[in-house]
């Protein structure tokens, strides 16, 4: 147990240095920050705020879990009521999910919104609210309401402010997940920032998946909503740590237009360009969540090709990514094509069993290792397989041989002893 | 590692003594046995046969995995061709699944059928064939074909013969799964014997789920097929060790009528009586498979009540039973209603979130422990919860509060360090 804790500590340090940026290129017109207000018992950051200098377009994708947390219900209502227009800020507390908390929980979430709006002199209902942490307990709402004006005074737009904001939404995450980039459309520079949290679910800290994208591009609410759905489908909905979906999962986007330029609608010529940029960006952010999967020692890309449809390709990829047997084999560094094939076979998708191919694509750029060709097993060079499986990153490519030509990517991690330790033994 | 192996060894001994019967009440007109013929490298039993003295009705439910093993394809064809009539025997090899073996594999399976039929002077295609074990390798078919006449000479109808037959189909199972019982219909005594194997999938020994029921009641093929589907839906399709479905899964039934009496068809008055008997029996056998789940330390019954439909109740139960987070919480003896609720919430079924109840039903008959009442968390007595979770057996009762009144049961085990060790570390 002590060895495991030590190993996890060192893994954390190494992940921090690998995946947390030292600088960034952030969108104009946003200020962010985070403080400790007293939700978490230790003194770590637990209240994060993000403020746009001007009211922005906003969109969100919420959990489909039937037990929707209070902040999910409240934020969804606000976005509906305002048709995704005039959203100025986001407030997030970590340490308590405000889920399964009844009417009182809804009132608490509304109070958080009202306090942000009145402090900033926003129009009413201009703020989205999110929570992550323990479920079934009421928020320490007084601490939060007292903290909000303090947090809002302490916002800024430096790299350190963004990093602090990303830290403020963490629960069991071992490192803050923050990405940023700039890109050009028609000669104009736009920037994107993304923050996320999530590392499987640990109760009492049920670690929700939260993700935020904010840009200074001018995008209509309708276009932003379409882009977010498309990007989420191909990023946060294509990752699996343990297959469970929490009561609080929320991915949201804001576009304030601070960088100027013509407003981008669904029919604009720039629409597909910005959709592609945001999708790639969302994938980058989602992959960080997988890298921080509880007890993860491997980062696995599952690439499914030649399916009849994108949906079929995704079903097969998801079936593999969620197979406990496959995930333990990866942890054991075992070139077990049987388990991969098995998971392909029970997915609800068209497969040509006589034309199915399975290969390992090594992360170091060396030649692929074929495991199954046209439904027949290859004689596998076990030494070569071991070499490939020693690397942290691995891509598994499956061709379903249907002639449909459709493709999907999915990202997952392995299932380790440490996962069981974190999720089963945390009381000891 | 050595401690784990030792623990598993002692767990095996204790399971053997608890779940393997010392005697039985077997159906008339069957002879069974098993030998070592040389499929497995060690000298354990690897070829089992079951022979009915007269041609019998037969039915089977096969894996829905798209990569169907050769014996699955061959047995299905035989049952189709003969409309489930005139089946005299079953032959099973363990140690090699004859899966993903192409045309040669089909030929091997057909040879096994032909050799049994010619040795017994059966009509052609009177034998069903099954295989379990490594996938992707051709059978050592000569050893098997030489072994078949030897095995068929050495059959009997004693308890020891039935036990030997159950041992002959084992791969990674830690104990043979054999049950038998007698029951009366209209004053006539009938008997049932059941054998099963399965303990999660371990590659290279991908441990298929196989199950057999044989009875001396006279049942038409149509009625038997209906009964088997009904019973399997409520037994083998209601268990989960790790959620994966193999290329070889097969549940089959035979009814030879050796006990006499009027033939039972779908319209007979005795139909529902024998269907209920076989269903209860199938549940008993399926539960043994869960008890032998890889690394299992807990046996968990999930009882979902007040669903809109049986299908909905089963979906919710299955969602909980397959949640890695729930299963690790059970291993950690943690009364984590949040994870249960979460799995309820993402199942594709009607749920009244304001009327959902969750309770622990202790195995020792003491009072239930309410965790969630009408969607609101109870103050849980942690000491009482710990007491309940110390027991090997536990029932979790969930009421969905829909007013539909439908109910389903599901059986599962926990997810332990040992599961990861068995499935990830077996090469070390």
Curated annotation (Swiss-Prot), chains A, B:
Keywords: Acyltransferase, Amino-acid biosynthesis, Arginine biosynthesis, Autocatalytic cleavage, Mitochondrion, Multifunctional enzyme, Transferase. Its main location: mitochondrion. It is found in: Mitochondrion matrix. The keyword Cytoplasm does not apply. One of its GO terms (biological process) is L-arginine biosynthetic process. Disulfide bonds: none annotated. It catalyses: N(2)-acetyl-L-ornithine + L-glutamate = N-acetyl-L-glutamate + L-ornithine; L-glutamate + acetyl-CoA = N-acetyl-L-glutamate + CoA + H(+). Pathway: Amino-acid biosynthesis; L-arginine biosynthesis; L-ornithine and N-acetyl-L-glutamate from L-glutamate and N(2)-acetyl-L-ornithine (cyclic): step 1/1; Amino-acid biosynthesis; L-arginine biosynthesis; N(2)-acetyl-L-ornithine from L-glutamate: step 1/4. Heterodimer of an alpha and a beta chain. This protein may be expected to contain an N-terminal transit peptide but none has been predicted. This is Arginine biosynthesis bifunctional protein ArgJ, mitochondrial.
